[in-house]
Each structure stands twice: as C-alpha cells, then as structure tokens.
Amino acid sequence: MDQPIQVNSEIGRLKTVLLHRPGEELEALTPDHMERMLFDDVPYLKEAQREHDAFADTLRENNIEVLYLDKLVAEALSTVELKWRFVIEMVRSSKQEDTYSTDAIINYLGSMDTLAMVRKIMSGVKKDEVKVIEPADKQLHHFLADDYPFYLDPMPNLYFTRDPAASIGNGLTINKMHWPARRREAIFMDYIVKHHPRFAQHKIPVWYNRPNRFSVEGGD
C-alpha cells in the first residue's frame, strides 16, 4: 500500500491536500480581541467561505483529493476514551487557570457529538454558553477577567493548515507554534497521525514534535 504521506518536492504533482473551511471561529473575532488572535481586520465569513469553496472545487477538478481537518479529527476520535482525552488536552492547553471553569468546559464539550465538539473547540467557547458555579472565595484576578467573552479562545488561523504541520518525505513535523493563540492547532495533527485509520497503521515518522523546545511554523 502507498504511504499516506509522500512529499519530496514543492513543485511535484499534488495528489492530496488538507484544508480547513473557514467557519464560526471567524465570526468570533471582534475589534477588541482580534490582535490577541493575530488578526488586524475582521474577515467577512461568507466571502471567505465562497473563496475557499472555489479553491477547493478547482483542486477537485484537477483530480486532487481534498481532506478536511475537522472531519479527520472527528474520525480519529473513534472511542469514548480518545474523545475525552482529546477534550481534556485541548482545554488544559488553553491555560485555563481555574479548576472550576476547566471542569465545566470539559463536561460541556464532552457531552457533544464528536464532530460538533471538534467544531466548537475550533470556534471557541463563550462564557455565556457554559454554566459555571463560581467559588465563594472568588479572587481579584477573576473579576479582572470577567469582561473577556471566552473561556476557550477561537482558532481563526486554522485555515493556514501548512503552519502547524509540514509533510517531509514519508513523515511530517508537528510544529510548536510561536504565538499562544496558535499553539493548540498542532494538537489536531497529533491526534490525526496517531489515531486516524488512514495514518495510524503506517507508523508515520514525526521528524519534529510540538513538545520540542523551539518553535517551527510553515511558510508562504
């Protein structure tokens, strides 16, 4: 069987590509918070989706297989145990400071259908979506953060799918992203490579992984 990853040239014939269709994570951007998310403008979702769909259709018309990030992740989380492990890792990697809110977010996400859960992690979890029982001894830093709308930040940069991972030969790098706003993106690729049936059985080499010390990102 052919290797699921085999990239030896930047100019060779493209057979398969991994994409992310812009989604609700773009609508979560606001002028007040877009700098934190590494944006300098708020994109128009419908136009972004129209342009993306035209691009994806062009790829298919040229006999290129198009894979989608959210669906691959959902397919990789094939057991209840994997699903919960993924949710816990995603939430804890978001640097939630309070145990009481962390547990509530984990339970909220874990109760969803797998694909819906993946998409919700991508689009972010707002504070008004989750019922959190606040502690009686609420500290000053809790009050200071009250005006921030998210428990779990959206991931509006996901459509740059070449940044968190790069195919090299029959393996790949799963990159440690430099900016905190993007560091959780690499977790998606980690679970796909380890657990998706298309990839897991091949024991794909990971040349560089996100726990490593130095940040690495894809380029234009």
Please identify what each model-predicted range represents:
Residues 1-220:
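The feature marks the mature, well-folded catalytic cores of soluble enzymes
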